[in-house]
Amino acid sequence: MAILAIKHSALGDMILSLPLLRAIRRHHPGEHIVLLTTAPYVDLMHRSGLVDEIWTDTRPKLWRIGETWRLIRRIRDAGFSRVYDLQGSQRTKWYYRLLAGARPEWVGNAPGCAYHIPDPTEPMHITELRRRQLALVGIPDPGLPDLGFLQSDIARFGLPPRYMLLVPGGAPHRPAKRWPAERFAALGNRLLHKGLTPVLIGRAAERGEIGAIKSACPEAIDLCEQTSIADLATLGRHAALAIGNDTGPMHIIAASGCPSLVLYSHESDPRKVSPRGDWVRLLQRPSLQDLSVEDAEAALPPARQG
């Protein structure tokens, strides 16, 4: 028999979904597990080894019915015995409706499905929601992400023994999710005096912030545009600390076991989606413009020793 799991995005959610896929795999030993996801996450999920096959969903506009129907026919023809909807979006509810007459057992939030988990009426962390969803079919608590499959050689970066990660970026279209670069720099300088070298992480879109931090904290090491997902996980395993905005790389770093402080504004709700673990601290202000360097430093978790 074959099992379909659906998880489209985004990076942080994909990291949080890894324990779910691991639990589904254990619950269905010997069955063929297929993941329906989007192109940016195919490589990550292949490397995880948690699924046997990956389908890419282009997520066409729902009015482009021809493309949507091709996917629906593919799902029907595969003869899945069960579908785990780990996305829980309007799109995946629509997929369920389009499968009328030939539906596999569906575990999700689509009204009328075999194992229905209602959408929460109050803020609930996605991990808890999915834990309850899987419990409907007898799957035990999936636990936390394990990124042991993400390994890389970070010796090429020439980092000192004691370093910390600064992740000042975020979605370009949501600038309110970013703590000001000058405060990242000020915090970096404070921690530099305590023996931790700041290492700057980001993409091309964050080049401006990282350049500003580097100017104000010249001893920081600039790795902008140089790190893969595997690099981030490996850097996180060896870093003493990490501090960053609510962005995908912080999910990877925190999931690697790095003591982490994640910063939130009114733009996102850490009660719904945030890294998990005893080594993770969350700090929120209505506006990150109002978060002082002193308050951020006070909120840091204990640094990893050695």
Regions found by a protein language model. Give the residues of each.
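Catalytic machinery of carbohydrate-active enzymes
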Residues: M1-G306
